[in-house]
């Protein structure tokens, strides 16, 4: 499973990018996106995905469907 950033809620602040341990987050077309192939939801490293902890916008980053 991977996390996904809601492009409607992303403010492009970039706070999520540097905290990702797998470097799965990158800017694209004015917002940030998460590469589902490399996102691990921080399993085995942290209790919660670090991007969710860093994001100041509620419900912007959620598990991908």
Swiss-Prot record:
Which coenzymes or cofactors are required? Answer: [4Fe-4S] cluster
Q: Which GO terms describe its biological process?
A: nitrogen fixation
Q: Which residues bind [4Fe-4S] cluster 1?
A: 10, 13, 16, 55
Look up keyword Zinc and say if it applies: no
Q: Record's Pfam families?
A: Fer4
Q: Does the keyword 4Fe-4S apply?
A: yes
Annotated 4Fe-4S ferredoxin-type domain residues: 2-30
GO molecular function list: 4 iron, 4 sulfur cluster binding; metal ion binding
**Any idea which UniProt keywords this protein has?**
4Fe-4S, Electron transport, Iron, Iron-sulfur, Metal-binding, Nitrogen fixation, Repeat, Transport
Q: Which domain of life is it from?
A: Bacteria
Residues reported in the UniProt entry to bind [4Fe-4S] cluster 2: 20, 39, 42, 51
> Which free-text remark accompanies the cofactor?
Binds 2 [4Fe-4S] clusters.
What biological function has been recorded for the protein in this entry? Ferredoxins are iron-sulfur proteins that transfer electrons in a wide variety of metabolic reactions. This ferredoxin probably participates in nitrogen fixation.
For this entry, the protein name equals Ferredoxin-1
Q: Per the UniProt entry, what species is this protein from, by scientific name? A: Rhodobacter capsulatus (strain ATCC BAA-309 / NBRC 16581 / SB1003)
């Amino acid at each position: 499973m991977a996390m996904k950033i809601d492009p409607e809620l992303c403010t492009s602040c970039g706070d999520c990018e540097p905290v990702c341990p797998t470097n799965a987050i990158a800017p694209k077309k004015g917002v940030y996106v998460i590469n589902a192939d490399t996102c691990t939801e921080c399993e085995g490293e942290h209790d919660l995905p670090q991007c969710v902890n860093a994001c100041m916008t509620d419900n912007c980053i959620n598990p991908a469907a």
